[in-house]
Amino acid sequence: MSRIHPTAIIEPGAQLHETVEVGPYAIVGSHVTIGARTTIGSHSVIEGHTTIGEDNRIGHYASVGGRPQDMKYKDEPTRLVIGDRNTIREFTTIHTGTVQDTGVTTLGDDNWIMAYVHIGHDCRVGSHVILSSNAQMAGHVEIGDWAIVGGMSGVHQFVRIGAHSMLGGASALVQDIPPFVIAAGNKAEPHGINVEGLRRRGFSPDAISALRSAYRILYKNSLSLEEAKVQLSELAQAGGDGDAAVKSLVDFVESSQRGIIR
């Protein structure tokens, strides 16, 4: 029995694994590739130069691979690449990249993308990320693995959200959130280390303690950013379980272009 509903439109050139399921009135464009066991909900549109991996579930009325909302876009064949085992719920929009950046929007593996989320052009979303309903990512946003973005939050262009961090609901984020940090508010401010998330991910008590010390250096000790960087670099060489985590935080802060929330 066919897994493609008779009312669905599969344009010539589209490459679908034989196990892909496509629901009623969905449209799959001619430059789309979809891997095994992925399901496309009714009325969804998958278009553009889009590659989708295996075991993904795309909900009803999703728009995946649409043109970038960038006035500089001139129909260049930019791309969207989605990994495996992602859940993308109803009315989500994910756009392809632009030539002004890398030309590709990416979504990793095992992500949970809730209803009405927007992932703009050139975004780079890692793996195991949760984007809650109505979270809105502007263009060029980077989100690290295991990060969580609360519902109805807005993220400014080019902002980075570090791995294992959490942005509370209804927040406005205009600068980078370092890894492991909780932020919330309009505009978003730091509110401690994501201790519960780190415990769930298997971080040791010593590593969590080191990250708490790093947070105090960065936010609680009335240090300038340059002074804090020096002390954080020293902490990253303490010889404990938390060295690697603190080092990743230091590297993130050092590489920030928009500045970190502070």
UniProtKB/Swiss-Prot annotation:
Homotrimer. This is Acyl-[acyl-carrier-protein]--UDP-N-acetylglucosamine O-acyltransferase. HAMAP family: LpxA. Its EC number is 2.3.1.129. InterPro entries: Acetyltransf_C, Acetyltransf_C_sf, Hexapep, Lipid_A_LpxA, Trimer_LpxA-like_sf. Involved in the biosynthesis of lipid A, a phosphorylated glycolipid that anchors the lipopolysaccharide to the outer membrane of the cell. It comes from Burkholderia mallei (strain ATCC 23344). The keyword Amino-acid biosynthesis does not apply. Pfam families: Acetyltransf_11, Hexapep.
